Design a protein with these regions (language model features):
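Flexible, solvent-exposed loop/hinge segments and secondary-structure transition points
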Residues: 1-92, 97-101, 107-128, 132-134
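N-terminal targeting and processing segments of secreted/endomembrane and organelle-targeted proteins
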Residues: 139-140
Length: 140
């Protein structure tokens, strides 16, 4: 099962009105809008993606780190490009190579983050069960 299928299955399981995108090597591989979302969510997806690609960390973690440091720099330099709220999640290969981002929008930002983390966890678990843990996208 692909990562995008894990996100879709999780959204169906939780009856979550989300949109999501999977970005690999800078290119959007999948973008899906479920009931309850619309084109306005694209802005959130893009800002979360930009944050993850710049930092190689989750957008929620970037926000928590900025809050702890007492500074929103460098995220304030262009608020139209970045957002330090949950829902942008990094994708890493098992060998430690950064691959891209899974971004979710449509729920409270902490729920967006939780869903992304859970989808990546399920995907990694499934790859391990099928003997593919040494290649592909395995952890986030």
């Amino acid at each position: 099962m692909r990562l995008s299928q894990e996100v879709f299955a999780l959204a169906m399981e939780e009856k979550a009105g989300i949109c999501y995108q999977v970005v690999v090597n800078g290119f959007t591989a999948v973008r899906c809008f479920l009931t309850g979302t619309d084109e306005s969510n694209i802005v959130w997806l893009e800002r979360k993606k930009n944050t993850v690609l710049k930092s190689r960390r989750s957008s929620l973690r970037c926000g928590l780190e900025a809050e702890a440091a007492g500074s929103l720099e460098p995220w304030q330099e262009d608020e139209e490009l970045y957002v330090i709220r949950g829902g942008g999640y990094p994708i890493w290969r098992q060998d430690g190579t950064f691959v891209g981002a899974l971004c979710i929008s449509g729920l409270h930002h902490e729920e967006d983050h939780r869903m992304a983390a859970e989808a990546v966890r399920r995907y990694a678990e499934r790859r391990k069960e099928t003997g593919h843990e040494g290649s592909g996208i395995d952890r986030g």
